[in-house]
Amino acid sequence: MDLYELLEPTLAGLGYELVDLERSPGGKLLRIFIDKPGGVNVDDCVTVSNHLSRFLAVENVDYDRLEVSSPGLDRPLKKTADFIRFAGESVKLRLRVALQGQRNFVGILREVKDGILKLEVDGKMLDLELTNLEKVRLVPKL
């Protein structure tokens, strides 16, 4: 079973969303990014870390170091639910295949529907296929 698929329901049961996970080359460092309504704090990270340490041992997942943190202000958007939740926000994204010779865009996420993300860039609306999105992140409001 995929590690993401293993962790997602476990974290949901604790009241957290699995935003992302990273594994270092060799798999010895495991980074888990979590969120919940209202955001996460250090106590949340400690709670999840303690729970996952035991859970991963039972599931026989090989790693040396576990890091649990919030996704940060520039959190990645990966799921359709993320795009719906953050509609109206500024995002920067990278496409797998260039559109009109360009792969990187910054704009306002307007909506996602039927596998198409609508991104407003300089007053123009772009229709981007979700399958062509390589990376999407929020642009922090400072």
Curated annotation (Swiss-Prot):
InterPro entries in alphabetical order: Ribosome_maturation_RimP, RimP_C, RimP_C_sf, RimP_N, RimP_N_sf
Major location category of this protein: cytoplasm
Record's subcellular location: Cytoplasm
Pfam families for this protein: DUF150_C, RimP_N
PANTHER family referenced in this protein's UniProt entry, alphabetically: RIBOSOME MATURATION FACTOR RIMP
Family in the record: Belongs to the RimP family.
Protein name, as recorded: Ribosome maturation factor RimP
Gene this chain is encoded by: rimP
